[in-house]
C-alpha cells in the first residue's frame, strides 16, 4: 500500500557535455518545466488518498462498501445545482469525500452570477425552451 504518489520526472537530462575548457560542462536540458517537484505529487494526492480509503473500507467492511461509495459519488457528481441557488458547489461530493470541513479557493473565488439569471431563465437555456 502506497501512501504517497509516485514522482514524475520534471525534466530529462542527457549526457552531452561541452568539450571546450572555457565553456562550463553541464548536462543539456531538453525539456524544462516551471513546476516545483512536489507539484506532481500534490496533483495525484487526492486520487491516492481516495484509493487508500477505498482499500481500507474493503478490508474492514467488505467489497460492498467501496462499490456503494463509488456509486454514490458518481450519482452525486452527475447532479447539478442551479446558478440562481449559488452555483455548482457540490456538498454531497464533499461529504462523501470527507472534505466537508475543508475550505479551498473554489469556495471563496466563485464565478459571479449573472444579474439576469433566474431559475426559470437557466432552465430555459439548459433545456432549450
From Swiss-Prot:
Keyword Nucleus listed: yes
CC terms in the record's Gene Ontology section: cytoplasm; cytosol; nucleus
Source domain of life: Eukaryota
A GO BP annotation: proteasome assembly
Keyword field contains Cytoplasm: yes
Any Pfam family hit: UMP1
Main location: cytoplasm
Family: Belongs to the POMP/UMP1 family.
Purpose of the protein: Short-lived chaperone present in the precursor form of the 20S proteasome and absent in the mature complex. Required for the correct assembly and enzymatic activation of the proteasome.
Protein name: Probable proteasome maturation factor ump1
Origin species: Schizosaccharomyces pombe (strain 972 / ATCC 24843) (Fission yeast)
Lineage: Eukaryota, Fungi, Dikarya, Ascomycota, Taphrinomycotina
Gene that produces this protein: ump1
Amino acid at each position: 500500500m502506497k501512501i504517497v504518489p509516485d514522482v514524475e520526472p520534471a525534466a530529462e537530462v542527457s549526457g552531452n557535455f561541452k568539450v571546450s575548457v572555457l565553456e562550463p560542462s553541464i548536462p543539456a536540458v531538453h525539456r524544462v518545466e516551471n513546476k516545483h517537484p512536489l507539484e506532481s505529487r500534490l496533483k495525484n494526492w487526492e486520487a491516492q488518498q481516495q484509493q487508500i480509503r477505498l482499500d481500507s473500507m474493503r478490508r474492514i467492511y467488505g467489497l460492498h462498501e467501496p462499490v456503494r461509495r463509488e456509486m454514490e459519488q458518481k450519482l452525486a457528481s452527475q447532479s447539478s445545482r442551479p446558478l440562481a441557488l449559488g452555483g455548482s458547489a457540490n456538498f454531497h461530493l464533499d461529504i462523501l469525500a470527507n472534505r466537508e470541513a475543508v475550505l479551498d479557493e473554489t469556495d471563496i473565488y466563485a464565478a459571479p452570477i449573472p444579474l439576469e439569471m433566474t431559475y426559470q431563465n437557466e432552465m430555459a437555456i439548459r433545456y432549450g425552451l
